[in-house]
């Protein structure tokens, strides 16, 4: 029984070290949703960006309104807010909690989301460190 307790903590850092940006971003979005620091949708996101309340902005590339993309990008550039782009608005909606979870834990009825703004990261996690490292490398 003591061996099991020793193995579990040693396995956790290996998973965190191999964490890619998408997995880390998904965990950071969950933690900020729990901390009530997440804003969904173009209107609310633009208000948070303009008031400089945002810490991080995530924009979906599959969103088909180019003027909104330009607006969000311009607001992020103007206020020096980091911007991460993801490929699918359905994936972004799933990550930010805009879906139903069935009995098996799989997402159903996923609602797409064009942009998500994080106002509060919540608690510090290794996933947050991965996201911050990614932002430092790409800036």
From Swiss-Prot:
Keywords: Nucleus, Ribonucleoprotein, Ribosomal protein. GO terms for molecular function: structural constituent of ribosome. Its main location: nucleus. InterPro entries: Ribosomal_eL30-like_sf, Ribosomal_eL8/eL30/eS12/Gad45, Ribosomal_eS12, Ribosomal_eS12_CS. GO terms for biological process: cytoplasmic translation; maintenance of translational fidelity; positive regulation of canonical Wnt signaling pathway; ribosomal small subunit biogenesis. Coiled coil: none annotated. GO terms for cellular component: cytosolic ribosome; cytosolic small ribosomal subunit; nucleolus; small ribosomal subunit; small-subunit processome. It comes from the Eukaryota. It is found in: Nucleus, Nucleolus. Subunit of the 40S ribosomal complex. Part of the small subunit (SSU) processome, first precursor of the small eukaryotic ribosomal subunit. During the assembly of the SSU processome in the nucleolus, many ribosome biogenesis factors, an RNA chaperone and ribosomal proteins associate with the nascent pre-rRNA and work in concert to generate RNA folding, modifications, rearrangements and cleavage as well as targeted degradation of pre-ribosomal RNA by the RNA exosome. Subunit of the 40S ribosomal complex. Part of the small subunit (SSU) processome, composed of more than 70 proteins and the RNA chaperone small nucleolar RNA (snoRNA) U3. Belongs to the eukaryotic ribosomal protein eS12 family. This is Small ribosomal subunit protein eS12. The gene is RpS12.
């Amino acid at each position: 029984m003591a061996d099991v307790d020793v193995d579990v903590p040693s396995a956790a850092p290996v998973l965190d070290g191999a964490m890619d940006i998408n997995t880390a971003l998904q965990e950071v979005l969950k933690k900020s949703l729990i901390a009530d620091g997440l804003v969904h949708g173009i209107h609310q996101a633009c208000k948070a960006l303009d008031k400089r309340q945002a810490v991080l902005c995530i924009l979906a590339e599959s969103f088909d309104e180019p003027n909104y993309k330009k607006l969000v990008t311009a607001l992020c550039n103007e206020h020096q807010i980091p911007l991460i782009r993801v490929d699918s608005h359905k994936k972004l909606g799933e990550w930010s909690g805009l879906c139903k979870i069935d009995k098996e834990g799989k997402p159903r009825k996923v609602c797409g989301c064009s942009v998500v703004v994080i106002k509060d990261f919540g608690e510090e996690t290794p996933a947050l460190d991965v996201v911050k490292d990614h932002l430092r490398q790409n800036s």
